[in-house]
């Protein structure tokens, strides 16, 4: 039976259509996915992301452990609360999960991992922690709400005390801070400003209602997906998985190659892949009518006149732009145009860098 977050009854009360999402009953939408999408781009929306897993790691060797476990290097994190995005890889360089890690001090870090990969993530972390003095604490006592949009920060700050408001208002992107019972982070998955806020489960309903009272509207999984795709952000299981390495998923920037003597899981395989070359992830824009969908073939001719083929990993109609966009994995050598096979028709598409909308503004 699918699990419920502490906010399940609130979703139902708001008229949500509930669906099973990787073993969790979650809101797909509250009546109109497109309205929810526009509300996040233009005002402020909130998502229940309590199905995600927060893992706190404590101990004298936790920094060394994470420098081995993750492709990005936590040694970069020297300011309290600073976060980074990284892949957690297998020995062949495939992505076990993508996650965010927060630094509190040399003996305390926090990971936020995906719900779909929870069990394998925890098993992987536990297995590799055996050689280190590390205490693993899964924070199932916490709920998590993401508040996103151009007015999200102002509306959240209305709910804070004056002293906390000053702290939060001064935060840069990709930081987290503990404010009594609330953990407030300047992170998100929409391409908009906002916060991801963790709190004790028993406080989630009250906080949700307070957000509603200051004009933050709920948004479901449907809008979350179109927003992240407009922002050019990867989704685990679509853009990457255990058979896909970061270089093929537009995650090359999350690999810390330096210092050269840092050994992390998957490094040897990645160095070979970097030397031989890999496919790459690109953005596609289709201004004709129709919708680009995952699984569709992408064709182009390379400099040698050879016909090459890739595949769409995620595609949708963009509510902000008014036409279809997609992410696609293709062989290197693609230029600024390609052909997509759509219902037995060859449709021309533009090839762009991943990322179509940021902070409400079109990038294409």
Swiss-Prot record:
Annotated EC: 2.1.2.10
Molecular function per GO: aminomethyltransferase activity; transaminase activity
Top-level taxon of origin: Bacteria
Keywords from the UniProt entry: Aminotransferase, Transferase
Key word Transferase present: yes
Function, in words: The glycine cleavage system catalyzes the degradation of glycine.
Recorded family membership: Belongs to the GcvT family.
UniProt subunit comment: The glycine cleavage system is composed of four proteins: P, T, L and H.
Name of the protein this chain belongs to: Aminomethyltransferase
Native species: Proteus mirabilis (strain HI4320)
């Amino acid at each position: 039976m699918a699990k419920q977050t502490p906010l399940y009854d609130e979703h139902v009360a708001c008229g949500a259509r509930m669906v099973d999402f990787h073993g969790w009953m979650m809101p797909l939408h509250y009546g109109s996915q497109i309205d929810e999408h526009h509300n996040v781009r233009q005002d402020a929306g909130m998502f229940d992301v309590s199905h995600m897993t927060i893992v706190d790691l404590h101990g004298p060797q936790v920094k060394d452990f994470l420098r081995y476990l993750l492709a990005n290097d936590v040694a970069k994190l020297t300011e309290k609360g600073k976060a980074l995005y990284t892949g957690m890889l297998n020995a062949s360089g495939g992505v076990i999960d993508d996650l965010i890690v927060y630094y509190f001090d040399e003996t305390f870090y926090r990971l936020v991992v995906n719900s779909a990969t929870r069990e394998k993530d925890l098993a992987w972390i536990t297995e590799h922690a055996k050689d280190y003095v590390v205490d693993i604490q899964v924070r199932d006592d916490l709920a998590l709400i993401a508040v996103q949009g151009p007015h999200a920060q102002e509306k959240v700050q209305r709910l804070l005390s004056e002293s906390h408001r000053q702290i939060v208002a001064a935060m840069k992107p990709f930081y987290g801070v503990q404010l009594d019972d609330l953990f407030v982070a300047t992170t998100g998955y929409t391409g908009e400003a906002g916060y991801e806020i963790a709190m004790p489960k028993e406080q989630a309903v009250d906080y949700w209602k307070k957000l509603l009272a200051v004009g933050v509207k709920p948004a479901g999984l449907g809008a979350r997906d179109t927003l992240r795709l407009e922002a050019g952000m990867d989704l685990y299981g679509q853009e990457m998985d255990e058979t896909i390495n970061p270089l093929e998923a537009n995650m090359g920037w999350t690999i810390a190659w330096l210092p050269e003597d840092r050994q992390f899981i998957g490094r040897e395989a990645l160095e070979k892949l970097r030397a031989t070359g890999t496919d790459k992830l690109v953005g596609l824009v289709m201004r004709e009518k129709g919708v680009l969908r995952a699984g569709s073939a992408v064709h182009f001719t390379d400099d040698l006149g050879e016909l090459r083929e890739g595949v769409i990993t995620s595609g949708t109609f963009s509510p902000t732009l008014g036409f279809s966009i997609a992410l696609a994995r293709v062989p290197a050598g693609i230029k600024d145009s390609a052909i997509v096979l759509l219902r037995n028709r060859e449709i021309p598409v533009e090839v762009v860098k991943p990322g179509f909308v940021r902070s409400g503004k079109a990038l294409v």
